[in-house]
UniProtKB/Swiss-Prot annotation:
Gene: NSF
Function: Required for vesicle-mediated transport. Catalyzes the fusion of transport vesicles within the Golgi cisternae. Is also required for transport from the endoplasmic reticulum to the Golgi stack. Seems to function as a fusion protein required for the delivery of cargo proteins to all compartments of the Golgi stack independent of vesicle origin. Interaction with AMPAR subunit GRIA2 leads to influence GRIA2 membrane cycling.
Subunit comment: Homohexamer. Interacts with GABARAP and GABARAPL2. Interacts with GRIA2. Interacts with PLK2, leading to disrupt the interaction with GRIA2. Interacts with MUSK; may regulate MUSK endocytosis and activity. Interacts with CDK16.
Pfam families for this protein: AAA, AAA_lid_3, CDC48_2, CDC48_N, NSF_ATPase_lid
Modification note: Phosphorylation at Ser-569 interferes with homohexamerization.
Protein name per its UniProtKB record: Vesicle-fusing ATPase
Electron transport recorded as keyword: no
Residues annotated with Phosphotyrosine modification: Y259
Organism listed in the record: Homo sapiens
Keywords: Acetylation, ATP-binding, Cytoplasm, Disease variant, Epilepsy, Hydrolase, Intellectual disability, Magnesium, Metal-binding, Nucleotide-binding, Phosphoprotein, Protein transport, Repeat, Transport
């Protein structure tokens, strides 16, 4: 049928605007007919018609969305012709529609069921024409929504014939809605409309993980397991589409607490988590910055941190982006409530404010709070419950594999520019740097670089760089080993100076008793290393004064090659109060728990306890603390060897401390003349003739002297003229009560 010229007009009523039909007079067309409207030779639009008597004959009325879509103006001359749908090819099978609130003032966060919306849509617009790109108004639950047709697929022809579906669907530009057409609603971009139900499209969500993110390039090494655990707990639920999370009834994790020794990568990990996520830039706050001298300002600072997340959640609901807030040194503001002195209670109210913001009455589901501390024991326990900082991750000292990764990261640029010598073996350095933290490994690389650079500085009155040699600058294995020896010592490692003074004269194996002590000590070391059933092994070396107990304990510790060795000695606690002693001992043991393998030597226990026989008197507070520490098993995966020494076994027996040790080893004095002669021969201070003279006096006789006292007597007698040395030595033995004999 040839087209006829008509004039565009305004839709006569609001009710007719909601029908999505063009309105004509019944003298021109009949209701239910479909027409093509041509505004130009290349622009044609399909409409379904309704009749209304108020429309002037020769006019065709359009709603505002229809006029916008077709680019029509009131009074415009257009060509209108009847159109007939081919129902075999143009019945709509599936139609995707973008939806949003029509007016800003009607925006709310109520959920809208897309299944009910789809049924209402089919009922309202059955047997109507729809085109891709068409705009219309849709009324549902007394709300007006703006719709935009995004995509149309024709119905499978087999279904129309009453046959099983073949799955063949063709995209079409214009189609007719029928009773079994399916409608899928898609939320408009940046819309806060909350759609639920199955009749909605899967949203094209931006991946929460930055596609350019790479673990090694980010400069994190040795934290693979920790990071995978954090990802599983905190981010796995955020990677899935919201509809799946909603169906599971799953709530996102809102908080992570990273704790561990200083320099192990807590701050670095938190910073890189922010970079890893496709979220807005994280807010990084140092704990003490929150505090303010004015009343209420500290709490206001907490509220400001969460303000953006609250505003966005109100506006976008479940589709709000992720807001990350990082608290460094969180223990500064989240101490146990009631633990602070003073009447202001500022710290308590700050904790209360933070608790209510993370998981209070008005819950935020678009935040991730990351707290960092090396004192998790100080933090209020309410902050650590599920729903708040529920993921607690220890960032401990890296193992050998982790140290290898960290050293690779810090030497990568040198390797790339051929500044790292071929003799540098990163694996060797990883083995040698036991108990080094990430920061200490970085410091080791810096120290080696400075050692290498120093070789190329001219030694003259001026500081000048030898540019000729600087061109061939190389950081060598020797630079790393020199830095390891002289510059960088691990905070949680073994300081050789601690125990070197105890064995500066070596171990004198004057007889089987000494060998037996060392052999038993080696067995206990192997038990600590290899046994999974006894992660805590403790041994008490007891014996008379000056028998060399401390030296043997230090030797066993040294031979163990454990990465962490500390000596808890009373000479480091002179003048300490009982409480200070307990805290010092606790710190040594706490540090030991952070290492995979640790050895703690508790020297001269009776002195630690302030024991004196007159009274008698001792410190019960220190005794109880020591008993607890001796029996406390290390954390999972850590192993601890404790070596104690005492000269008063009887006193420890009365205090019931002997039972706290796994085993007791007796360290005797030199008891026979033969043992004394063996010690003298090993020491080599006397000549053969002098030793023969001494042997005549002591051989086959009983003596009683500690090896430490023997060394003192030998050194004293050596100060005499050679002809009087032996006589002086024998006299000193008699005076010390080492022998009942009268020596000539």
């Amino acid at each position: 049928m040839a087209g006829r010229s008509m004039q565009a007009a305004r839709c006569p009523t609001d009710e007719l605007s909601l029908t999505n039909c063009a309105v004509v007079n019944e003298k021109d067309f009949q209701s239910g007919q479909h027409v093509i409207v041509r505004t130009s030779p290349n622009h044609r639009y399909t409409f379904t018609l309704k009749t209304h008597p108020s429309v002037v004959p020769g006019s065709i009325a359009f709603s505002l969305p229809q006029r916008k879509w077709a680019g029509l103006s009131i009074g415009q001359e257009i060509e209108v012709s009847l159109y007939t749908f081919d129902k075999a090819k143009q019945c709509i099978g599936t139609m995707t529609i973008e939806i949003d609130f029509l007016q800003k003032k009607s925006i709310d966060s109520n959920p809208y069921d897309t299944d009910k919306m789809a049924a209402e849509f089919i009922q309202q617009f059955n047997n109507q024409a729809f085109s891709v790109g068409q705009q219309l108004v849709f009324s549902f639950n007394e709300k007006l929504f703006g719709l935009l047709v995004k995509d149309i697929e024709a119905m499978d022809p087999s279904i129309l014939k009453g046959e099983p579906a073949t799955g063949k669907r063709q995209k079409i530009e214009v189609g007719l809605v029928v009773g079994n057409s399916q409608v899928a609603f898609e939320k408009a971009e940046n819309s806060s409309l909350n759609l639920i139900g199955k009749a909605k499209t899967k949203e094209n969500r931006q991946s929460i993980i930055n596609p350019d993110w790479n673990f090694e390039k980010m400069g994190i090494g040795g934290l693979d397991k920790e990071f995978s655990d954090i990802f599983r707990r905190a981010f796995a639920s955020r990677v899935f589409p919201p509809e799946i999370v909603e169906q599971m009834g799953c709530k996102h994790v809102k908080g992570i607490l990273l704790y561990g020794p200083p320099g192990c990568g807590k701050t670095l990990l938190a910073r890189q988590i922010g970079k890893m996520l496709n979220a807005r830039e994280p807010k990084v706050v140092n704990g003490p910055e929150i505090l303010n001298k004015y009343v209420g300002e500290s709490e206001a600072n907490i509220r400001k941190l969460f303000a953006d997340a609250e505003e966005e959640q109100r506006r976008l609901g479940a589709n709000s982006g992720l807001h990350i807030i990082i608290f460094d040194e969180i223990d500064a503001i989240c101490k146990q409530r009631g633990s602070m002195a003073g009447s202001t209670g500022v710290h308590d109210t700050v904790v209360n404010q933070l608790l209510s913001k993370i998981d209070g009455v008005e819950q935020l589901n678009n935040i991730l709070v990351i707290g960092m501390t090396n004192r998790p024991d100080l933090i209020d326990e309410a902050l650590l419950r599920p729903g708040r900082l529920e993921v607690k991750m220890e960032i401990g000292l890296p193992d050998e594999k982790g140290r290898l990764q960290i050293l690779h990261i810090h030497t990568a640029r040198m390797r790339g520019h051929q500044l790292l010598s071929a003799d540098v073996d990163i694996k060797e350095l990883a083995v040698e740097t036991k108990n080094f933290s990430g920061a200490e490994l970085e410091g080791l690389v810096r120290a080696a670089q400075s050692t290498a650079m120093n070789r190329h500085i001219k030694a003259s009155t001026k500081v000048e760089v030898d540019m000729e040699k600087a061109e061939s600058l190389q950081v060598t294995r020797g630079d790393f080993l020199a830095s390891l020896e002289n510059d960088i010592k691990p905070a949680f490692g073994t300081n050789q100076e601690d125990y070197a003074s105890y064995i500066m004269n070596g171990i004198i194996k004057w007889g089987d008793p000494v060998t037996r002590v060392l052999d038993d000590g080696e067995l206990l070391v192997q038990q600590t290393k290899n046994s999974d059933r006894t992660p805590l092994v403790s041994v008490l070396l007891e014996g008379p004064p000056h028998s060399g107990k401390t030296a043997l304990a230090a030797k066993i510790a040294e031979e163990s090659n454990f990465p962490f060795i500390k000596i808890c000695s009373p000479d480091k606690m002179i003048g300490f109060s009982e409480t200070a002693k307990c805290q010092a001992m606790k710190k040594i043991f706490d540090d030991a728990y952070k290492s995979q393998l640790s050895c703690v030597v508790v020297d001269d226990i009776e002195r630690l306890l302030d024991y004196v026989p007159i009274g008698p008197r001792f410190s019960n507070l220190v005794l109880q603390a020591l008993l607890v520490l001796l029996k406390k098993a290390p954390p999972q995966g850590r192993k601890l060897l404790i070596i104690g020494t005492t000269s008063r076994k009887d006193v420890l027996q009365e205090m019931e401390m002997l039972n706290a040790f796994s085993t007791t080893i007796h360290v005797p004095n030199i008891a026979t003349g033969e043992q004394l002669l063996e010690a003298l021969e090993l020491l080599g201070n006397f000549k053969d003739k002098e030793r023969t003279t001494i042997a005549q006096q002591v051989k086959g006789k009983k003596v009683w002297i500690g090896i430490k006292k023997l060394l003192m007597l030998i050194e004293m007698s050596l100060q005499m003229d050679p002809e009087y040395r032996v006589r002086k030595f024998l006299a000193l033995l008699r005076e010390e009560g080492a022998s009942p004999l009268d020596f000539d």
